[in-house]
Swiss-Prot record:
Classification via InterPro entries: ANF_lig-bd_rcpt, Glu/Gly-bd, Iono_Glu_rcpt_met, Ionotropic_Glu_rcpt, Iontro_rcpt_C, Peripla_BP_I
Topology versus the membrane: Multi-pass membrane protein
Cytoplasmic face residues: 578-631, 840-917
Name of the protein in its database record: Glutamate receptor
Entry similarity comment: Belongs to the glutamate-gated ion channel (TC 1.A.10.1) family.
Alphabetized UniProt keyword annotations: Cell membrane, Glycoprotein, Ion channel, Ion transport, Ligand-gated ion channel, Membrane, Postsynaptic cell membrane, Receptor, Signal, Synapse, Transmembrane, Transmembrane helix, Transport
Glycosylation sites: N62, N95, N121, N125, N229, N251, N261, N272, N418, N419, N424, N491, N775
GO cellular component: postsynaptic membrane
GO MF annotations in UniProt: ligand-gated monoatomic ion channel activity; signaling receptor activity
Function: Receptor for glutamate. L-glutamate acts as an excitatory neurotransmitter at many synapses in the central nervous system. The postsynaptic actions of Glu are mediated by a variety of receptors.
Length: 917
């Protein structure tokens, strides 16, 4: 019953909390064609109310109006509706005609309007508009200047195009040395735009046309497709510059083979972590309930709408932090009264100015990148990606434009030059020195220029020669200038091999070059020619030291102690049960007048020891109890000795090593052993971008460790492992660790399994004419077994003996060090036996001297002669109760024991065994 009541109580409490949350009214005005923007706006509010409303103690209550934004009258009615609701802010779209109406209403009633549409030049400090869409006219001009276009055809389809044209004229005036001629035409439809471009081409078919298409991205795609599919138009004569901010929204696969050159801007960076999360969530939505969602394709207007809600959330949260009673005061004052557009009284919100100012102060990383605003409510400090599509090339990011710097950063100014006559030129292959992939002879190791490819050898060199022969090109090897594989710099550019490919300083990269998602976004890769993974290299630990008592290792010290106690315990129990069992008492064979018991305490110990050593004994138990004790002891010793024997061979002949770590988890849990990666490369990026908790903890350690655990080169990492005396682990590719560990001085070791699964591939610039041919060559080499053959040649050059790991041993011959302890025990036992015999000899001589009333020296000499000769030559006089029998060769002494008779209470005193004499 209690288990049923508790969930109901929790549900009731949560409902009470939800019902007590303050509601913050906001409004939305969206065009009927802005489906994705409206969905993103609604979903962002939904996510806030569900996940964060309990934290901020309020929830957003929105009311959205869908209309034709070009209808100023409908826009006026919508504004009046939202003002009458007391909305604290209004979000939506606008155009050139309706924006003036919106400005008039929002400025009059002091209600902020956050728009995702284009900004206007007539904004001033008193305006209540926030523009999520950045002004990027300077970026357009910088691209035109970068290409040195002196004449541009400007095609537009809306009033916003006229505004942008005006901005374009104003922006080009700053380039005094460069005169840009702009021809303008307004198009009414896709078909109309296609015919205008066809006429433009037919007027001068040999002229190259630079066209700025100021239309929506989807419309521009349709126009260009029509131009491309017209056989009468030479597509190579057109270079289109798109005026929208969604270059990646078009399907560029249609244009790769059409010869059309297209350049455009991208506001949403698809590789930004915030946008990646947004796109992932967007693709998982149900398109029935969330129209336009459920796909990986998100237009930039939807991203702007999502960021607009996040902007308000941040600003309003900041207000509540400063003034927790803001909502209560806003309802009780003039701000709580309904505002009607028909009222003559000028009722203005008392909070509009505060909300507006807070929104201008907000800075955050949104779906559209860095979000910040200036005093006029325009975006600042934003970055636009510049992308290009050209013949034989896919979509490539060729640069970026940053508002703060106000200039274009091009990755390669010559990226779009496509000279077909250069197809058969000698190709430049960039690589990096790393054994056994690429190695150079000492002849040129210190030389700067390379003369030919002969001095270079290795796995990748064999691969290069093979693909060059199959594809049919000449090549020259070039080492990467900065010695790194490639990583993203703070300004968005790449260094290393990746940077050289992006800048077209090399035609391909054949090296131990890992295929990663980040690299694949800016360059192309073939299928992997080698599969591997990140693993851990440590200094090879010394084998476990051999000691004199190695033969005791099959059993732990606890077991040996238990065996000793068991031996003593069994001997004592056997002695006791033999004492109390009548069957163990019998007449002495020497003197039938005496009864004896074979199992004295010394004989019991001797019996137990003989059984444990798997040896026989002259005496055996006669009673049932004694035989039970003996049986269980024999069974015990059988199992113990069998187990010991089974393990003894392995422990004496198998050399074992104890490694301090066995996995990445072991590394992450300790701090004694440092670990790191190469400074620039895929291994470092793997830990940096990993979502796995263990690898995140390892990355946090590596970035904070002092001194730095990162190394500049692969060789430095190996040397650091060798010189750190086991206190540094190097994280690198498994194939490299295997190679180094099998080369002299044989002092490194790979531990644990691979942390991931990677592959090495041939890298090319995006859209390279050799990409597909290289890909086919790699597949053919893999199928023919050539890759496996080269891998065996270059990697299976073992110079080290087979070593054991901590789990598997390498069998070796038995040495004296393994069994030295046995010899020591033997020698020690012999020494103890000799000393014991000497003690007995002296003690017996002393006792005999007292009994025979002779000197100790005489008795000692007599005993010595008896010990050495085995008999006494002269007659010896006996004393005491001993009688002498003389024979020719020996003298036998017979001793008579006590004359006690049976039946008395003292019958058994001092006659427990026949071995007392």
């Amino acid at each position: 019953m209690d288990t049923c009541v508790f969930p109901l109580v929790v549900l009731w409490i949560s409902m009470r909390i939800t019902s007590t949350l303050d509601e913050v009214p906001i409004g939305g005005i969206f065009d009927s064609r802005s489906v994705q923007a409206l969905t993103a706006f609604r979903h962002e509010i939904h996510m806030f109310n569900r996940a964060y409303s309990h934290v901020y103690r309020y929830k957003l209550k929105n009311d959205t109006t869908i209309l034709d934004v070009t209808d100023s009258f409908a826009v006026s009615n919508a504004l009046c509706h939202h003002l009458s609701r007391g909305d604290l802010a209004i979000f939506g779209v606008s155009n050139a005609s309706s924006l003036a109406t919106i400005q008039s209403y929002t400025d009059t009633f002091n209600v902020p309007f956050v728009t995702i549409s284009m900004a206007q030049n007539n904004s001033h400090n008193g305006s209540y508009q926030i523009y999520m869409r950045p002004m990027y006219i300077n970026a357009l001009v910088d691209v035109i200047v970068h290409y040195r276009w002196e004449k541009v055809a400007f095609y537009y389809d809306s009033d916003e195009g006229l505004v942008r044209l005006q901005q374009l004229f104003q922006a080009t005036n700053k380039y005094d040395k460069m005169i840009i001629s702009i021809d303008t035409k307004r198009i009414t439809s896709v078909e109309n735009g296609y015919h205008m471009l066809k006429e433009l081409h037919l007027m001068d078919p040999e002229m190259e046309h630079r066209v700025l298409l100021d239309v929506r991205t989807d419309k521009a795609e349709q126009i260009i497709l029509k131009v491309m599919n017209d056989s009468k138009i030479n597509n190579a004569k057109f270079h289109f510059l798109l005026g929208d901010l969604g270059m990646l929204e078009i399907n560029t696969t249609h244009f790769k083979i059409g010869g059309v050159n297209i350049t455009g801007f991208q506001l949403v960076d698809p590789f930004n972590s915030t946008s990646e999360l947004f796109i992932s969530t967007w693709s998982s939505l149900d398109p029935v309930y969330w129209p336009g969602a459920g796909t990986n394709h998100v237009n930039y207007e939807a991203a702007l709408a999502a960021d607009s809600v996040r902007l308000f959330k941040s600003a309003f949260g900041s207000i509540l932090q400063k003034d927790p009673n803001f909502l209560r005061r806003s309802r009780s004052g003039t701000a709580g009264k309904s505002m009607k557009c028909t009222d003559d009284s000028e009722i203005k919100t008392g909070h509009g100015q505060m909300i507006l100012e807070e929104m201008k102060k907000v800075k955050f990383e949104g779906v559209t990148g860095h979000v910040a605003f200036n005093e006029q409510g325009h975006r600042k400090d934003f970055t636009l990606g510049v992308y290009n599509v050209a013949m034989t090339r896919g979509t490539a990011k060729i640069g970026y434009w940053n508002e703060r710097e106000g200039k274009l950063h091009a990755h390669n100014p010559r990226l779009f030059q496509n000279n077909s006559s250069d197809m058969n030129r000698t190709r430049i292959v960039t690589t990096i020195i790393k054994e056994p992939y690429v190695m150079v002879n000492n002849v040129i190791r210190d030389g700067k220029p390379l003369v030919g490819n002969e001095p270079v050898e290795g796995f990748c060199i064999d691969l290069t020669k093979a693909v060059a022969e199959k594809v049919g090109f000449d090549f020259v090897i070039q080492f990467v200038k900065d010695g790194s594989y490639g990583s993203v710099l703070s300004n968005g550019t790449w260094d290393g091999i990746v940077g050289e490919l992006i800048r077209h300083e090399a035609d391909m990269a054949i090296a131990p070059f890992t295929i990663t998602a980040d690299r694949s976004r800016v360059i192309d890769f073939t299928k992997p020619f080698m599969s591997l993974g990140i693993s851990i290299m440590i200094k090879r630990p010394q084998p476990a030291g051999k000691h004199f008592f190695s033969f005791m290792e099959p059993l732990s010290s606890e077991i040996w102690m238990c065996i000793v106690f068991a031996y003593i315990g069994v001997s004592v129990v056997l002695f006791l049960v033999s004492r109390f069992s009548p069957n163990e008492w019998h007449l002495s064979e020497a003197h039938h007048s005496y009864i004896a018991n074979d199992f004295s305490i010394s004989n019991s110990l001797w019996f137990s020891l003989g059984a444990f050593m798997q040896q026989g004994c002259d005496i055996s138990p006669r009673s049932m109890s004694g035989r039970i004790v003996g049986s269980v002891w024999w069974f015990f010793t059988l199992i113990i000795i069998s187990s010991y024997t089974a393990n003894l061979a392995a422990f004496l002949t198998v050399e074992r090593m104890l490694t301090p770590i066995d996995s990445a988890e072991d590394l992450a849990r300790q701090t004694e052993i440092q670990y790191g990666t190469i400074m620039s490369g895929s291994t470092k990026a793997f830990f940096k971008n990993s979502q796995f908790q263990t690898y995140q903890r390892m990355w946090a350690y590596m970035t904070s460790a002092q001194p730095s655990v990162f190394v500049k080169t692969h060789e430095e990492g190996i040397q650091r492992v060798r010189q750190s005396n086991g206190k540094y682990a190097y994280l690198t590719e498994s194939s490299t660790i295997d190679y180094v560990s099998n080369r002299k001085p044989c002092d490194t070791l790979k531990v644990g399994s691979n942390l991931n699964s990677d592959g090495f591939g041939i890298g090319t610039p995006v859209g390279s004419d050799l990409r597909d041919k290289l890909n086919f060559s790699v597949l053919e080499l893999r199928e023919n077994g050539d890759l496996a053959k080269w891998e065996k040649i270059w990697f299976d050059r073992g110079e080290c003996p087979q070593h054991s790991s901590n789990k598997e041993g390498a069998q070796s011959a038995l040495t004296l060090a393994n069994v030295a302890g046995i010899f020591y025990i033997l020698i020690g036992g012999l020494v103890v036996a000799v000393l014991s015999a000497a003690f007995e000899f002296l003690y017996k001589s002393r006792m005999d001297s007292r009994k025979s009333r002779m000197s100790f020296g005489s008795a000692l000499r007599t005993k010595a002669r008896l010990s050495f000769k085995g008999h006494i030559d002269s007659e010896q006089k006996t004393t005491g109760n001993g009688t002498r029998r003389r024979s020719h060769n020996s003298v036998t002494y017979t001793y008579t024991g006590p004359t006690n008779v049976m039946g008395g209470s003292h019958a058994f005193e001092d006659s427990n065994t026949h071995t007392e004499v």
